[in-house]
A protein has these predicted regions:
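N-terminal Lys/Arg-rich, disordered targeting/topogenic segments
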Residues: 1-4
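Hydrophobic membrane-insertion alpha-helices, especially the h-region
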Residues: 8-25
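Catalytic glycan-binding domains that act on GlcNAc-containing polysaccharides
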Residues: 27-217
Length: 217
């Protein structure tokens, strides 16, 4: 065999070996990337579960609310535990207080209402959606105002809107300027999780549009 042919064959073998090694390394990299993606997705699934999805979709649609918002509120209020009761008496998936729930029951004309009925997921979601719809109407559909009011009460948020430290226009709030405390933390988590639930589970327009008003007379 001529020396030039031997050298050519050796070079070809080296090129093929390098190409094969590169392909193997690329395949191994892609496998690692896929496993990392699957692990990340599992972590999201574990941290952001979705239960009662049919009820959330159906009832939120009745009140023209984003199901992602409802799922996020439920996640932060009760972690989807339907019978949980807080130390201050809030109950169920959306952690409704007794006085608020009784007022909502009156608005919904539920003459047979009892507080323990809020352990029922559909009932609790309906009450929570009614209340969020009411707050959305009151605060012109501003997401931050609505979420803060759900946590701290509408009177507190009205006072924040009247304070130039927290609102420059009396209509919207600046989250970075809100007073430090549980409501600021809560609102940040709900709005963050809203985006995650929206991206992962739901395909719907953003919640910033104003809902149809409920009868609050």
């Amino acid at each position: 065999m001529p020396s030039w042919l031997r050298v050519s064959l050796i070079c070809l073998a080296v090129i093929l070996a390098v190409s094969f090694t590169a392909q193997m390394l690329m395949n191994a990299y892609l496998v690692r990337q896929q496993k990392a993606h699957e692990a990340e997705q599992k972590a999201i699934d574990d941290h952001y579960p979705l239960m009662y999805a049919d009820s959330i979709r159906r009832i939120s649609a009745e009140y023209n609310l984003s199901p992602s918002l409802i799922a996020s509120v439920i996640m932060n209020e009760s972690s989807f535990r339907p019978t949980v009761q807080s130390s201050v008496g809030a109950r169920g998936l959306m952690q409704l207080m007794p006085d608020t729930a009784e007022w909502i029951a009156h608005k919904l004309r539920m003459d047979d209402y009892r507080f323990e009925m809020l352990d029922d997921p559909d009932t609790n979601i309906r009450f929570g959606c009614w209340y969020l719809n009411y707050l959305s109407t009151l605060f012109r559909g501003d997401p931050l105002c609505v979420v803060c009011a759900y946590h701290a009460g509408q009177g507190e948020i009205a006072s924040w809107l009247a304070n130039p430290l927290y609102s420059t226009d009396g209509i919207t709030l600046n989250r970075d300027s809100l007073p430090d405390g549980p409501t600021k933390i809560y609102a940040g988590r709900v709005i963050r999780d809203y985006g995650i639930y929206q991206a992962k589970y739901f395909d719907q327009a953003d919640f910033t549009s104003s809902p149809d008003p409920v009868d609050s007379d």
